[in-house]
Design a protein with these regions (language model features):
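Juxtamembrane helix-loop transition sites at the ends of transmembrane segments
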Residues: 1-2, 134
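Bacterial N-terminal signal peptides that target proteins for export
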Residues: 3-13
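Hydrophobic helical h-region of N-terminal Sec-dependent signal peptides
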Residues: 15-20
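C-terminal motif of bacterial Sec signal peptides marking the signal peptidase cleavage site
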Residues: 22-25
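Bacterial signal peptide processing site
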Residues: 27-30
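A surface/extracellular/periplasmic glyco- and lipid-processing/surface-interacting theme
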Residues: 33-43, 47, 51-97, 101, ...
């Protein structure tokens, strides 16, 4: 919106007529001083002055995109643990999540889908939480955490953490969960984000931004190179993200098949973070160490930016920097974070054959 303020004034200069005085000179001769000519009246107009007030655009904290509905900005982030077992596919909600973390679990992967700017009714299938979720998701400012099942040690740790427990055992009696009749247990537990948000505590707070974003006219860092795809070996799953220049997004495949959601839409994201971490163990479960530092590849706007990730506290967002030490800026939109083991990904450059590129 523009505000215009205009000041106009005419400056007029009054005419001045000066009459000469008759002065007697010596010798009796007198001269009359000629009258000075009247000064010309000049009208001057000051140019119009325009003042523009720019109203800042309100953006969603987890996407950097303009907020379509500002009334939802104060609600908390909602994390849903989504199953990736072959019998759980296709899933509901992966293309509606602002962020998705893919984690290694026992010989498979699982998704931590983070909703804030929009929801998904239904969402799922929903499976168990893991000890690694506590630190990995800790920067989202006490988010709601929807999950189902887990051993007593993990359950106790989650309930004592900064994650707000909305597990099946807590929220099912309040109408938070239901079984999908077209699927078999345990791959058929689903929920509605609308209902889960309604169960948020009164003091719930919105998430803080997790990344820095480029302006629309801002170029990607020069510390980048063109890319067409990345191939990633996760536990029990082969993942590929391929740049689609027509859609201006990265599209996902797993196990050499296009990964589509329940609406038959290809799973996609504007940014893909491939973050190398050390995985420890807790019993039989892997535990990603998400505090510290390591190598990162950030795929955005059709390029690869290589650099490092760093995090000193689990309640702080990850900091991603390129090889020059500058913070990597993301493209506004949805982001996937692949939490991988070291040396589990390859980049595929323009001119290379995607089909011939082998998974690491």
């Amino acid at each position: 919106m523009k505000n215009h303020s205009t000041t106009r004034r005419n400056l007029g200069i009054a005419s001045v007529v000066v009459l000469g005085l008759i002065v007697a000179s010596c010798g009796g001769k007198s001269d009359t001083a000629p009258a000075l000519p009247a000064e010309e009246v000049v009208a001057t107009t000051v140019p119009e002055t325009t003042t523009t007030t720019t109203i800042p655009v309100v953006v969603n904290p987890l996407t950097g995109a303009p907020a379509a509905d500002e009334s939802i900005l104060n609600r908390p982030a909602l994390i849903v643990k989504i199953d990736n077992h072959p019998r759980a596919r296709p899933q509901w909600g992966l293309n509606q999540a602002d962020l998705v973390f893919e984690e290694n679990v026992e010989q498979l992967t699982r998704f931590a889908a983070v909703f804030h700017s929009q929801g998904s009714d239904p969402v799922g299938p929903i499976r168990s939480g893991r000890a690694q979720d506590i630190d990995l998701l800790g920067s989202l400012n006490h988010p709601l955490f929807a999950w189902s099942g887990g051993n007593s040690k993990v359950t106790s740790a989650i309930r004592k953490s900064w994650l707000v427990d909305l597990s099946h055992s807590v929220a099912n009696e309040k109408g938070g969960y239901r079984r999908e009749s077209s699927r078999n247990a345990p791959h058929n537990l689903i929920a509605e984000t609308t209902k889960l948000w309604s169960l948020a505590p009164e003091d719930a707070k919105p998430p803080v931004p997790q990344f820095e974003y480029r302006a629309a006219d801002e170029p990607v860092t020069t510390a980048s190179k063109p890319t067409i795809a990345t191939k990633i070996t996760m536990d029990g799953v082969k993942v590929m993200w391929e740049w689609n220049p027509d859609l201006l997004t990265f599209v996902r495949s797993q196990d050499d098949k296009a990964h589509v959601d329940m609406q038959d839409v290809r799973v996609n994201a504007q940014n893909v973070v491939v973050m190398s971490v050390v995985y420890g163990k807790s019993g039989s479960s892997p535990v990603a160490k998400s505090v510290g530092s390591g190598e990162v590849w950030v795929y955005t706007a059709g390029v690869l930016v290589q650099g490092t990730w760093e995090r000193t506290d689990p309640e702080l967002p990850f900091v991603y920097k390129d090889i020059t030490g500058e913070v990597i800026k993301f493209t506004p939109g949805r982001t996937w974070i692949e939490v991988i083991r070291a040396k589990s990904a390859i980049n595929i450059a323009p001119g290379e054959d995607i089909k011939k590129a082998k998974y690491p």
